[in-house]
Amino acid sequence: MAEQTASGYIQHHLQNLTFGHLPNGDWGFAHTAAEAKEMGFWAFHVDTLGWSVALGLIFVLIFRMAAKKATSGQPGALQNFVEVLVEFVDGSVKDSFHGRSAVIAPLALTIFVWVFLMNAVDLVPVDWIPQLAMMISGDEHIPFRAVPTTDPNATLGMALSVFALIIFYSIKVKGIGGFIGELTLHPFGSKNIFVQALLIPVNFLLEFVTLIAKPISLALRLFGNMYAGELVFILIAVMFGSGLLWLSGLGIVLQWAWAVFHILIITLQAFIFMMLTIVYLSMAHEDNH
C-alpha cells in the first residue's frame, strides 16, 4: 500500500485476474486493466470463476455431509442447521410459488446458499486474499478480485440462467402461442380485431421491456450492493494506509461496525435474489396473464 497511490490501490483491488488472448498473439494473464480490455469478449475472469466453483463445491459437500449423517434420532448441529435452512427456503417457495414443479425448491435453496457464500467472501479482510494470490504467483502486481458477486459478469450470468428458465417454463406451460400472445395481446386489448392489431406493437414493446428488465434488475441489484460494500472496505483500508485513521481503535470500530452491518446486506441480497427468482418463475407458470 505504501508504494501505491490510493487510486492505484483501489483499481488494483477492483480488477479481475483475467486470462485471454494477449496483443502479441499469446494466451496469458492481463497485468493491467488496459491489457484485460484489449482481450475482448473471450477473456476469462479466473478469480470469479475459481471462487464461484469452489464455493459451489463447498455448498455441495456440506449438504452431502449433512445428508449422509442425517438420522431420525438426536440430530447433530449440522443436521439442525441444514434442516432449518431447508424449511426456511421451502416455506418461502410455498408462500410465493403457485405452480407445480419439483425443481423450484432445490433451485431456490441452491441460489440462496450459493449467493450467500459468494457474498460472504466480502467479510474477509480486503488484503488477505490478494496477498495470498501474490505469494502463490510470485507476482507482486497481479490483480485479484476475491468477491464473485462484485463482478457484473457473475451476477449477469446467474440472472441470465434464471431468465432462460423463465422463457422455458413460460413456453412449456402456455405453449408457443400462449407465450407470444402474452407478449402481444396484453396489457391493452380490444374486441375490435383491427384495433387489436394496431395495439400489438405497443403491447409487445411494453411486455418486452418488462421481460428484459427482470434479468437486468436481478443482476444489477446484487452487483451494485456488493460492489458498494466492497468499495467501503477498500476505502477504510486506504484511510489506514494514508494515516488518516491514526487512532487504531477508531479503525477497528469502523471495520467492525461495517462488517456487522454488511452481514445483514449479504444475507438480504441472497434472500432477495432467491425470492425474485421464485416470483418470476411463479409468473412463468401462470396460465393466464
From Swiss-Prot:
Family matches, as CDD domains: ATP-synt_Fo_a_6
GO annotations of cellular component type:
plasma membrane; proton-transporting ATP synthase complex
Assigned keywords, A-Z: ATP synthesis, Cell inner membrane, Cell membrane, CF(0), Hydrogen ion transport, Ion transport, Membrane, Transmembrane, Transmembrane helix, Transport
Membrane topology according to the record: Multi-pass membrane protein
Top-level lineage group: Bacteria
InterPro entries given in the database record:
ATP_syn_F0_a_bact/chloroplast, ATP_synth_F0_asu, ATP_synth_F0_asu_AS, F0_ATP_A_sf
Q: Which residues cross the membrane?
A: 43-63, 101-121, 160-180, 193-213, 232-252, 259-279
Molecular function as annotated in GO? proton-transporting ATP synthase activity, rotational mechanism
Q: Where in the cell is it found?
A: Cell inner membrane
**UniProt xrefs under Pfam families:** ATP-synt_A
Any one biological process term the GO annotation gives: proton motive force-driven plasma membrane ATP synthesis
Similarity field: Belongs to the ATPase A chain family.
Q: What HAMAP family does the annotation carry? A: ATP_synth_a_bact (MF_01393)
The record describes its quaternary structure and partners as: F-type ATPases have 2 components, CF(1) - the catalytic core - and CF(0) - the membrane proton channel. CF(1) has five subunits: alpha(3), beta(3), gamma(1), delta(1), epsilon(1). CF(0) has three main subunits: a(1), b(2) and c(9-12). The alpha and beta chains form an alternating ring which encloses part of the gamma chain. CF(1) is attached to CF(0) by a central stalk formed by the gamma and epsilon chains, while a peripheral stalk is formed by the delta and b chains.
What does the protein in this record do? Key component of the proton channel; it plays a direct role in the translocation of protons across the membrane.
Protein name according to UniProt: ATP synthase subunit a
**Organism in which the protein naturally occurs:** Pseudomonas syringae pv. tomato (strain ATCC BAA-871 / DC3000)
Query: In the UniProt record, what gene is named as encoding this protein?
Result: atpB
